[in-house]
């Protein structure tokens, strides 16, 4: 029966044995859930790849060794390490050890504060100064929660919470690991002077000095069952520590591997705290990652505080002789930690915070050599540990570990003083300028710690010194022929009197008779000191607990019995001075009588027993952590930035990147290449309107593009009527007309009158695409913004940095023929063969394969046929072949001026003079509804040349559908098509009719008889054909506004395609920014819907134009640029309250200014400063329009509706079923001049702190010049905004 009962309780018994070992390990390991350690790990991986993986593993083994030795000391001696050091070292040595432990605790507290501040910043959007203050203020909650629970309950609860957090932390990383391959194929470790700084930071992140003292103290609070031997208990502690620290290393390895793959492989450098945090947030690929991090850090901070409450007071009492309440102790440490945090936030910004985290770990590493000496000395001391001293092998491992730490420290100090590494230069220039004390602090810390280490290494333990003196006296006493009893009594009396102070310092162990028992350990002269360590502790402890009541039994035992019943502790060494000279067991009678008659000994034991009980009561203080995840409503967010913006993660509102993080890895989620592209896209857009002085360009005035100041009150039928199928290549040669757009914008091109209005405008370059006047109108609108060849930044930067953030692209699709009409095939055949890899075309091209029936439904689903039919068919007779047009380009056309950039098209027409030797197409099938979409689909793919012009008209010579129809001619299966010359009879228009025979290849298909294709064709047929004359008519304000809005849509789509663009549209600023966020959310939805539709068609095998190098990926990747064309063909309009009017461009200007200033807060690359300066220079023209007079915020209209099923993916999220939410309460006003002035001040402070390395081109030229240029434009902004601010008052 007893056996069955024991078996039933076996799991409970196992847990009862395991918890005393696992509990202390969990409470210690929770301190490694620390942003400082993440930053050090990510920094090592980002700078040196996988070179530091092996050193980090070795550091983890050393940490396991140190924590095991600390726990072993507590288990064996039943005293914590601080108490033993107090016994073994003098007062001043203990004081310095206490200062080192306090510095380590303060460093941990500092990193925890910064981590919690970062979490608050992500969750609530507050600036970092406020977040740091709030994170520090939570210390006042500790006394309140500490009084709510009893000591044992608080300890158990905190242990459980610590285990739960660590499990979430470990398994969360492993389960949610991003798609970054783990590189475990043994890379060689390459160490150099450049990596010493990173090695020191990893060492400090792996081992914390105060944990040595804390672990041994917590072990005393988690005593194991009395029937377990101490060897078994030590083994339990070892396995618990091994498992926990293995999990910590696994997490660090995943972080380092991710950093090496994301940052080191792409050459990016981390410079800010959000950079490191962004990678950690990427590892947890969940939308609730910021909230989870904040919660984990909050609980980790409270449990760390509880752990220090369990053992920290003993440390301070034994080292610093301080007896202060726990709450005051915690508040003092918190205040000391907050001072450098706030100083760094105010002076150095986000980049300074990141450097502070790394420097904190380095400073902790500098303290390690002097901190491990007491640990290793005591663990290997026979006088303290007795037979439980560590084995010679462990002593050797400890010595090697110490030498390794000391060697790294020496190399670090020597390099810091005499070296010229990059990290040394970074520390030195701040010292020369007097703006930072980090170099001096590290140097002082290293020197003082080195001196203390030498002192500790040269100072033996007091117990060892006393034992040596006793051995000397033993030899002298053996030469004296006196009665042994008299010698013993005199010696014992003298030593007890003179050693009273020593006895009073001993702590009473749980067993009252332990001090007496310790005498017997040394009394036995013939005892073997190398007795095997297999004595069962259960028997020893049984005798020890009854020793006070059975003195006679113990006193008259044999010497061997005394030794077996002894627990070798510190008392055995400290009291041995009074009993070591007794050679005979007979003297034990006198010794026992004298000890029992001594009041000081008994008094000391009794008092210490009471103190032990009181200490247990005092150390029970704990407080239950409060959930810090309570949301703050968006209405409490301020529009202004409080404090230096450079110290905030992009105004404290970055989402992953971070906030995350240029030169930085991902500055607020935008990589370096993405930021370059962002600046290029914005410069490209605003370059159509403003020059670099913020003035309207002459060309914009000529073409009436300065429509932002015009109050247009035109009917909706005249506002957004342009449904051109082609935007200029500067914005990805657009094709419009999506089914979703068609359904929403019912007023688009729904009457012949609207078409006639637009049909009166010809192309400004005199290029007529076929007989369609509407086409001419649109090309005139698109060409109006041509700026010249200088706008090649966007796509060239994409190609150049494609390996960093964007998929690689080629220009194989860039220079394909726009159409076969109006061009000589021979002049472009070689170019096509080069790009497409054809061996030869020989003047002939294969026609596409017969159209798949699956293309029909695709055409039918787009009822408006905005770009698929209308752009091709307007102005054509219903009997004309609308799939192709004739382009008659005259020799005097202004298009010739664009030949350097469009020579493939204009050159062919100009050089050949449209020779009559070439043959012209005379008839073509009416497949406009089929060929158009798929010609458009791939038109912009790899559009490196045409996507970089500033305006809309740089690719005048090619139409939206002409480009891609023959882009994959090599894959066609049809018969050859001959193109010989431009027929005079058909130079301006198609005159051939289609064969009406339904069985003919050219007959109208059934699905072409529906929709609006015929309607548009009929309307177009009445417009007639137009000549190639150059029409320089000035466009109306309506047309100008339509052009700008289409360009704006195109710009938004390009921004959405940037890697990490989510941050751009989730900043929750003013009403203008919220409106742009809603527009971006709508455009994203449309884009993704079209992507899914295209993917569905491809999956069904309906596309004959699939190109071989198409890659799968994100819906907003650059390799899906072709789908962009289908989205931006028109401008929505839902009525009088529609947001799609010129005011939207003003809001976009405010948004651009805000985003550029936000990026400038954290940017540290002079190259990008220059790009931001270009954009800000142009955006000066918006200031007058946006801030000269109060503006009424526009609310999102029905054009911005998003289905409820998609709202969780949109940004910002919608609050109702259809419409995005209006501006949030409290933030419903437009961004004011005061808001931007505060932000500009923050940028100026941030930029002033950025410096390059002296003696380099970057430090001596790029940084000063970049700062000068950016500061200049910021001053102009301040002057203009200040004037507007005064005027508004």
UniProtKB/Swiss-Prot annotation:
Protein name: Ethylene-insensitive protein 2.1
Example of a GO biological process term: iron ion transmembrane transport
GO molecular function, one term: manganese ion transmembrane transporter activity
Biased composition (Polar residues): 635-652, 807-816
Entry annotated with the keyword Transferase: no
GO cellular-component term (any): nucleus
Transmembrane feature ranges: 18-38, 48-68, 96-116, 128-148, 155-175, 199-219, 235-255, 260-280, 288-308, 335-355, 356-376, 393-413, 439-459
Family statement: Belongs to the NRAMP (TC 2.A.55) family.
Phosphothreonine: residues bearing it: 819
Ranges annotated as biased composition (Acidic residues): 616-626
Comment field on protein domains: The N-terminal (1-562) region seems to be regulated by upstream components of the ET signal transduction pathway, and may in turn regulate the C-terminal region. The C-terminal (454-1289) region regulates downstream events of ET and jasmonate signaling pathways, and can confer constitutive responses to ET. The nuclear localization signal (1274-1281) is required for interaction with ETR1.
Domain of life of the organism encoding this protein: Eukaryota
């Amino acid at each position: 029966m007893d056996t069955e009962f024991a078996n039933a309780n076996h799991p409970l018994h196992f847990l009862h044995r395991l918890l005393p070992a696992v509990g202390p390990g969990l409470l210690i390991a929770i301190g490694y859930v620390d942003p400082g350690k993440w930053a050090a790990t990510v920094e090592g991986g980002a700078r040196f790849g996988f070179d530091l993986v092996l050193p980090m593993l070795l550091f983890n083994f050393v940490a396991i060794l140190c924590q095991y030795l600390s726990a072993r000391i507590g288990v064996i001696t039943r005293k914590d390490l601080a108490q033993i050091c107090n016994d073994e070292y003098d007062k001043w040595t203990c004081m310095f050890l206490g200062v080192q432990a306090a510095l380590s605790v303060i460093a941990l507290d500092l990193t925890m504060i910064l981590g919690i501040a970062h979490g608050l910043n992500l969750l609530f959007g507050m600036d970092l100064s406020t977040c740091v203050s709030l994170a520090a203020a939570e210390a006042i909650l500790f006394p309140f929660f500490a009084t709510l629970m009893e000591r044992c309950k608080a300890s158990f609860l905190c242990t459980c919470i610590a285990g739960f957090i660590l499990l979430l932390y470990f398994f969360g990383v492993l389960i949610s690991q991003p798609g970054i391959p783990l590189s475990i194929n043994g890379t060689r470790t390459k160490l150099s002077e450049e990596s010493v700084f990173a090695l020191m930071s990893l060492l400090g992140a792996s081992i914390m000095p105060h944990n040595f003292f804390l672990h041994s103290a917590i072990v005393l609070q988690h005593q194991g069952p009395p029937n377990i031997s101490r060897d078994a208990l030590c083994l339990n502690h070892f396995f618990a520590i091994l498992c926990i620290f293995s999990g910590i290393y696994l997490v660090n390895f995943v972080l380092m591997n991710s950093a090496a793959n994301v940052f080191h492989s792409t050459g990016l450098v981390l410079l800010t705290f959000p950079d490191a945090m962004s990678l950690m947030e990427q590892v947890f690929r969940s939308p609730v990652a910021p909230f989870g991090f904040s919660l984990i850090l909050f609980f980790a901070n409270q449990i760390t505080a509880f752990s220090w409450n369990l053992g920290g007071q003993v440390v301070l009492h034994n080292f610093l002789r301080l007896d202060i309440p726990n709450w005051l102790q915690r508040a003092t440490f918190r205040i000391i930690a907050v001072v450098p945090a706030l100083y760094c936030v105010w002076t150095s910004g986000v980049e300074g915070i990141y450097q502070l985290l790394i420097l904190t770990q380095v400073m902790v590493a500098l303290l390690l050599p002097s901190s491990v000496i007491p640990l290793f000395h005591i663990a290997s001391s026979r006088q303290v540990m007795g037979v439980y001293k560590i084995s010679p092998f462990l002593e050797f491992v400890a010595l090697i570990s110490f030498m390794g730490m000391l060697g790294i420290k020496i190399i670090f100090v020597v390099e810091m003083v005499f070296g010229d590494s990059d990290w040394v230069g970074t520390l030195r220039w701040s010292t020369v300028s007097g703006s930072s004390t980090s170099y001096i602090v590290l140097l002082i810390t290293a020197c003082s710690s080195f001196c203390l280490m030498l002192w500790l290494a040269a100072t033996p333990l007091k117990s060892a010194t006393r034992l040596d003196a006793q051995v000397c006296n033993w030899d002298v006493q053996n030469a004296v022929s006196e009665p042994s009893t008299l010698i013993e009594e005199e010696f014992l009396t003298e030593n007890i009197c003179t050693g009273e102070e020593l006895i009073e310092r001993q702590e009473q162990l749980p067993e009252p008779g332990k001090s007496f028992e310790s005498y017997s350990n040394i009394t036995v002269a013939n005892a073997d000191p190398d007795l095997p360590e297999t004595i069962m502790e259960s028997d020893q402890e049984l005798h020890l607990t009854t020793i006070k009541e059975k003195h006679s039994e113990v006193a008259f035992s044999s010497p061997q019995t005394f030794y077996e019943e002894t627990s070798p502790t510190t008392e055995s060494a400290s009291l041995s001075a009074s009993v070591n000279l007794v050679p005979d067991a007979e003297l034990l009678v006198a010794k026992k009588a004298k000890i029992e008659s001594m009041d000081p000994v008994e008094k000391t034991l009794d008092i210490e027993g009471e103190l032990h009980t009181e200490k247990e009561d005092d150390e029970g203080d704990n407080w239950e952590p409060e959930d810090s995840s309570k949301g703050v409503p968006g209405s409490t967010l301020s529009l202004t930035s409080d404090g230096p913006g450079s110290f905030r993660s992009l105004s404290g509102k970055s989402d992953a990147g971070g906030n995350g993080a240029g030169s930085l890895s991902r500055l607020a989620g935008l990589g370096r290449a993405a930021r370059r592209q962002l600046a290029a896209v914005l410069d490209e857009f605003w370059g159509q309107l403003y020059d670099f002085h913020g003035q309207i360009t002459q060309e914009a005035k000529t073409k009436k593009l300065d429509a932002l100041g015009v109050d247009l009150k035109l009917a909706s039928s005249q506002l957004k009527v342009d449904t051109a199928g082609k935007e200029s290549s500067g914005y990805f040669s657009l094709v419009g007309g999506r089914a979703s757009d068609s359904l929403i914008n019912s007023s688009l091109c729904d009457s012949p009158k609207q078409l006639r209005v637009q049909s009166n405008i010809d192309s400004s370059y005199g290029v007529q695409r076929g007989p369609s006047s509407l086409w001419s109108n649109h090309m005139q609108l698109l060409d109006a913004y041509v700026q010249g060849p200088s706008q090649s930044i966007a796509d060239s930067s994409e190609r150049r940095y494609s390996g960093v953030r964007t998929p690689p692209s080629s220009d194989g699709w860039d220079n394909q023929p726009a159409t076969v009409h109006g061009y000589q095939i021979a002049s472009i055949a070689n170019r096509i063969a080069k790009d497409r890899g054809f061996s030869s075309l020989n003047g002939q091209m294969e026609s596409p394969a017969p159209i798949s029936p699956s293309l029909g439904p695709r055409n039918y689903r787009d009822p408006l046929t905005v770009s698929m039919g209308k752009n091709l068919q307007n102005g054509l007779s219903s009997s004309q072949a609308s799939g192709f047009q004739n382009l008659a380009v005259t020799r005097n056309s202004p298009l010739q001026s664009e030949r350097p950039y469009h020579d493939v098209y204009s050159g062919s027409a100009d050089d050949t003079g449209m020779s009559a030797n070439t043959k012209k197409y005379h008839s073509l099938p009416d497949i406009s509804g089929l060929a158009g979409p798929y010609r458009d689909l791939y038109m912009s793919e790899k559009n490196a040349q045409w996507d970089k012009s500033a305006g809309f008209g740089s690719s005048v010579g090619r139409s939206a559908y002409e480009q891609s129809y023959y882009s994959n001619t090599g894959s066609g299966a049809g018969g050859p098509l001959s193109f010989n010359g431009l027929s005079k009879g058909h130079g301006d228009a198609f005159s051939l009719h289609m064969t009406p025979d339904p069985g003919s290849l050219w007959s109208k298909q059934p699905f072409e008889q529906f929709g609006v294709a015929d309607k548009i064709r009929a309307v177009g047929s009445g417009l007639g054909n137009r000549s190639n004359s150059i029409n320089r008519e000035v466009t109306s304000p309506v047309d100008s506004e339509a052009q700008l809005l289409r360009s704006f849509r195109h710009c938004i789509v390009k921004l959405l395609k940037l890697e990490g663009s989510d941050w751009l549209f989730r900043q929750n600023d003013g009403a203008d920014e919220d409106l742009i966020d809603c527009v971006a959310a709508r455009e994203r939805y449309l884009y993704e819907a079209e992507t899914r539709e295209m993917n569905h068609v491809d999956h069904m095998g309906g596309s004959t134009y699939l190109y071989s190098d198409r890659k799968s990926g994100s819906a907003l990747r650059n390799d899906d640029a072709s789908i962009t064309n289908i989205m931006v063909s028109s401008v929505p309009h839902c009525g009088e309250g529609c947001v799609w009017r010129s005011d939207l461009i003003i809001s976009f200007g405010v948004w651009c200014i805000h985003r550029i200033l936000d990026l400038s807060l954290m940017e540290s690359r002079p190259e990008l400063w220059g790009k931001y300066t270009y954009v800000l220079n142009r955006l000066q023209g918006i200031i007058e329009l946006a801030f000269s007079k109060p503006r009424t915020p526009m609310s999102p209209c029905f054009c911005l509706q998003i289905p409820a099923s998609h709202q969780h993916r949109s940004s910002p999220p919608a609050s109702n079923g259809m419409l995005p939410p209006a501006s949030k309460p409290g933030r419903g006003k437009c961004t004011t001049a005061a808001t931007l002035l505060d932000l500009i001040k923050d940028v100026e402070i941030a930029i002033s702190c950025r410096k390059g390395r002296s003696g380099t081109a970057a430090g001596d030229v790029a940084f000063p010049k970049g700062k000068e240029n950016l500061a200049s434009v910021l001053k102009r902004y301040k002057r203009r905004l200040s004037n507007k601010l005064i005027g508004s008052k």
